[in-house]
Structure formats: C-alpha cells, structure tokens
C-alpha cells in the first residue's frame, strides 16, 4: 500500500471521526485533491485510492493533465486558481468547476465561452472573508451583487462559495472568519435554490472548516506529500 493510499484513508477516517464526535450528521464531505505540481503517476495513485475530484491552480498545467487522463471518465476537474480574463475561454471549455469567480467580468466571460458545452459549468464565488489585501476574492460588502450576476448566467450553475481565510494568531479571530463565511453561505441558500457547496478547509484547517459546516475541503500536502498522523 502506497503513502497516498494510506494518507487518503486516514483523512477520510479523521473526517468521519470528527463529525461523529461533534454529533454532526455523517454527511458526505467532498475531498478535492489539490494536484498542482504533482505528476501524473501520483494522480493515478490518488484515483486508485478513491479520489475522483482534483483541483488545479494553473491553467496550462491543468489542461495537460486533463488531456493525459482522458481515459478516466469519472474524474471531475476544478479550477481553483486566480482566473485571468484571457484564460476564461480555455477554463470554460475544459474544466467542470471553477471555484474562484470574484468579479462580474469573469462570470460573464465564463458564461459566454461555456455556451458550446451541453451542460453548465459548476461555479463558486470566491469571497475574501479576511479582507486581506494580498488575497483574491470579492470583499464581503459586495458579494450580493456578484451572486445575483452569477445566478443569471444560463451556462453557469451557481453552487456556492469558496474561501481561504487568513491564518490568525488568535483562534477566536480565526473562528470569526469561518463563522462569517458560514453565515454568507446560509444567506445565499435562502436566496438561490442551487446553492449547496461551502468550499472551505485545506490540509491545515480541516477540523475548523468542518466545525463551521464545510462540505468541500481542498487537500494537497496531506494527500501527496506528508505522512498523515
């Protein structure tokens, strides 16, 4: 049994243990394997270990992998990097999800270029929940307007929000960010029937993300590099 297989088993067990310990419903938590800078062989090992959704940060690297792994028809590809206007066509034509819509122009362009496909692209709105100058994502005060724009795009399926909160020194402040994100998610659920996805949590904050009801976590290092304990 390889390390990737072992890591995935441990991560899944940790998730289910946390949910049970906190009396949360034993719901299905989607694990997105962040596969940037990972070789095809490692991705194949993850696939053989039961992972079927992968996140890519760089367009061309992602496209190369999609082409090389075409025979795996059940694989779902997420674009999780910053979306540049001149890359929207290739993203819309090749990826199943885009998790990082943070401005109206990007939503409009993705919708335009997705038209050739027979099914809409699943999308998330990226929110800069910590209001960091260096982070991508729309600021909290403007999210409602962007949500409305996305919801009106016929070739986009508006599924929810994605966040990457800043790592805070004080846990109370960290949890405030997660709490605010969960609040926005629930507000959007009231407004739009299609909303069902809160993409929150990485290798280093899985438990915190689950505590605030994330149902999609993005894990790279703990799958492909470290031996999880």
From Swiss-Prot:
GO molecular function: pyridoxal phosphate binding
Keyword Transmembrane: no
Matches recorded under CDD domains: PLPDE_III_Yggs_like
PTM annotation (N6-(pyridoxal phosphate)lysine): residues: 36
Presence of the UniProt keyword Endoplasmic reticulum in the record: no
Family, similarity comment: Belongs to the pyridoxal phosphate-binding protein YggS/PROSC family.
Function summary: Pyridoxal 5'-phosphate (PLP)-binding protein, which is involved in PLP homeostasis.
Name of protein: Pyridoxal phosphate homeostasis protein
Organism whose genome encodes this protein: Buchnera aphidicola subsp. Schizaphis graminum (strain Sg)
């Amino acid at each position: 049994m390889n390390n990737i297989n072992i890591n995935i088993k441990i991560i899944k067990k940790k998730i289910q243990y946390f949910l049970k310990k906190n009396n949360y419903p034993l719901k299905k938590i989607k694990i997105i394997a962040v596969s940037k800078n990972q070789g095809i062989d490692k991705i194949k090992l993850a696939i053989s270990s039961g992972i079927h959704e992968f996140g890519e940060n760089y367009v061309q690297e992602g496209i190369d992998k999609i082409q090389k792994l075409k025979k795996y028809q059940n694989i779902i590809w997420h674009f999780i990097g910053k979306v540049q206007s001149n890359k929207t066509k290739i993203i819309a034509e090749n990826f199943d999800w885009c998790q990082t819509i943070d401005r109206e122009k990007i939503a409009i362009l993705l919708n335009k270029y997705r038209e050739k496909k027979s099914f809409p692209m699943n999308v998330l709105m990226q929110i800069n929940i910590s209001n960091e100058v260096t982070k991508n994502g729309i600021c909290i005060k403007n999210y409602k307007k962007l949500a409305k724009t996305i919801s009106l795009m016929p070739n986009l399926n508006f599924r929810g929000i994605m966040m990457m909160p800043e790592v805070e020194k004080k846990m109370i402040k960290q949890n405030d960010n997660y709490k605010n994100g969960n609040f926005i998610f629930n507000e959007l659920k009231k407004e739009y029937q299609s909303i069902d996805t809160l993409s929150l949590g990485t290798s280093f904050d899985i438990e915190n993300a689950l505590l605030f009801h994330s149902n999609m976590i993005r894990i790279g290092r703990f799958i492909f590099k470290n031996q999880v304990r």
